[in-house]
């Protein structure tokens, strides 16, 4: 469930039905996204080609912004997205768990849907580290060239492409070295 919650919900399933039990209280007027990642497979062990997203809201509308693009140089990439709260957060975002995570398709495409207006930072990482805070000393990652991605009401940002390098980088302020 995205954005990430302090306490993960409990899943109960029987047959074709899944029940999601929220241990945390939900924020008012917030759009939440239930993500089914590519690890889900059928009885023949065939995995999903792309992750699936379902949205619900605790308010009277579901947010409708989106950010999409391609991760280059990776067959197992994941896009990590942080909503930036303030100026200080714009340089320290990678030290906290991403607000949103989405596995890219085999061809590298990803799409975050149901996003609220605001400023976001995005990076690509191998999906084995998906959903984790970034440790620049231990993880390969790629940043988008824009310092932040501004999303307005009913706004779709396309072609937010990211190159995932072959060697480790270092985040220094907002510049990738």
Language model: regions and residue ranges:
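Acidic, low-complexity Ser/Thr/Gly/Pro-rich repeat segments typical of extracellular/periplasmic
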Residues: 1-114, 119-121, 137-143, 166, ...
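Short, acidic, small-residue-rich periplasmic hinge/interaction motif at the N-terminus
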Residues: 170-172
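Structured interaction patches on ligand/partner-binding surfaces of diverse proteins
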Residues: 50, 126-168
